């Protein structure tokens, strides 16, 4: 039975331009794929769901990837509780930009670790792949965080990416509140790349707010 306490989670989707951040977010919230989408400045979406028998209100901020909006980044990085660092497996540049975003998040938060998941998007375009799965896994290990490949178009692992970030936030907060611990640490192991398709039973009914 799901808990009735409604906890809000401020999730931020970060990455360069054109790697599918907005498509991932809209697929999660509205369950459809957008072929054409205007470059995002900043869009916020809300969705209520149940993750591991706990009710959660996801407040998802889809951010600008373009360089001209870089001055806005520190503002949303200060308020975010967890971050999806998204790159396209078809773009080497978007992959290389992930390091900059991760370092900026840790600098703004003044932390050695913070809830982050590395997301390799557009995994349905495997024939156009220029970033291997192993490279994504290696970068996530370097960050001490989890890794997953997704496809907004084919709806592969879309919910898993967001829900696993919520789980990581919960784990982080639990460690931070543990008086006998020394603060939150990175996960002990990376996330294995899930097979195509959403995992069954990880979430109950979801409601767009």
UniProtKB/Swiss-Prot annotation:
Membrane topology classification: Lipid-anchor
A GO cellular component annotation in the UniProt record: plasma membrane
Propeptide: 207-209
One Pfam assignment: Ras
EC number per UniProt: 3.6.5.2
Top-rank taxon: Eukaryota
InterPro entries: P-loop_NTPase, Small_GTP-bd, Small_GTPase, Small_GTPase_Ras-type
ATP-binding keyword on record: no
Compartments in which it is found: Cell membrane
Record keywords: Cell membrane, GTP-binding, Hydrolase, Lipoprotein, Membrane, Methylation, Nucleotide-binding, Palmitate, Prenylation
Entry annotated with the keyword GTP-binding: yes
Family membership noted in the UniProt record: Belongs to the small GTPase superfamily. Ras family.
Name of the protein in question: Ras-like protein
Lineage: Eukaryota, Fungi, Dikarya, Basidiomycota, Agaricomycotina
